Amino acid sequence: MATELRCPDSMPCHNQQVNSASTQNPEPQQAGDLILAHAGGNSDSAATLTLLSGHAHSSVPAELDPQASGGATFNSENNGGTGNYDAPASDSLLGDCEISRQIGAQLKLLPMNDQIRELQTIIRDKTASRGDFMFSADRLIRLVVEEGLNQLPYEECMVTTPTGFKYEGVKFEKGNCGVSIMRSGEAMEQGLRDCCRSIRIGKILIQSDEETQRAKVYYAKFPPDIYRRKVLLMYPILSTGNTVIEAVKVLIEHGVQPSVIILLSLFSTPHGAKSIIQEFPEITILTTEVHPVAPTHFGQKYFGTD
């Protein structure tokens, strides 16, 4: 059963308009490095993308699905239809080398394996039942949340076992919280609570203005001491990046530094990741896949409104 959130009524709400050729490839420098070469450059313009471990998985297709498009009705990230968001045609993980360099240290990918690939496949499959979709989404969310917790600071501690022995272990440093970007980000809340029972969770509501299509903050409510906490920002699909950018701006207004924000997502386009890192170079993005086509039907199918 999902836990009802109770945040202090004293926190401010926001209602404001927000303006928002091939070359010879170099060798990886160390295990876990993925070399990204500029399509029109030379070996000096290679960039390194940080992987959490092991294997690099290429997920950029030779061509995009011609039917992968949809109109935006909820916000600038999630399209209302069942189609997918197409990143700009020129956008690719192998595109702008300078941006790839900036992404390198901040963008973290879960190591690809068959289990994760299957979950991604079911989530993208338009014929998947809602039950299968939710089951797969919850499993993938749990994997992302677990790795997100691994990015938080720990401290050493000593405990006594039932047999009387001393054990040197670690524990979370105090001062962590979650923030979900409504509505699709709420799908990740239970996964976080399953791992951290007592963690505080705030919310931000951002929608696209029907006339200008610009992101607009309608509501924000956080723990009163959020400026002292590490923040796990939850938003499953990064397509344009606009919604996340506005959410981070609201967090900054409440005293949160971008360097303590870890963005948890399931899927990201190259354009979305680049946009966020360009705006906030210190933020950390954790995702399972960077792909030009984002499954922006996620929120509608997860909550049964597709």
From Swiss-Prot:
Keyword Oxidoreductase attributed: no
Main location: cytoplasm
Pfam families: UPRTase
Keyword annotations from UniProtKB, A to Z: Cytoplasm, GTP-binding, Nucleotide-binding, Nucleus
Keyword Nucleotide-binding set for record: yes
Chain residues that bind 5-phospho-alpha-D-ribose 1-diphosphate: R183, Y235, P236, I237, L238, S239, T240, G241, N242, T243
Comp. bias regions, Polar residues: 13-28, 70-79
CDD domains, A to Z: PRTases_typeI (cd06223)
GO molecular function, a single term: ribosylnicotinamide kinase activity
Listed GO CC annotations: cytoplasm; nucleus
Residues binding uracil, per UniProt: T296, H297, F298
Record-stated family: Belongs to the UPRTase family.
Protein name per its UniProtKB record: Uracil phosphoribosyltransferase homolog
Organism: Bos taurus (Bovine)
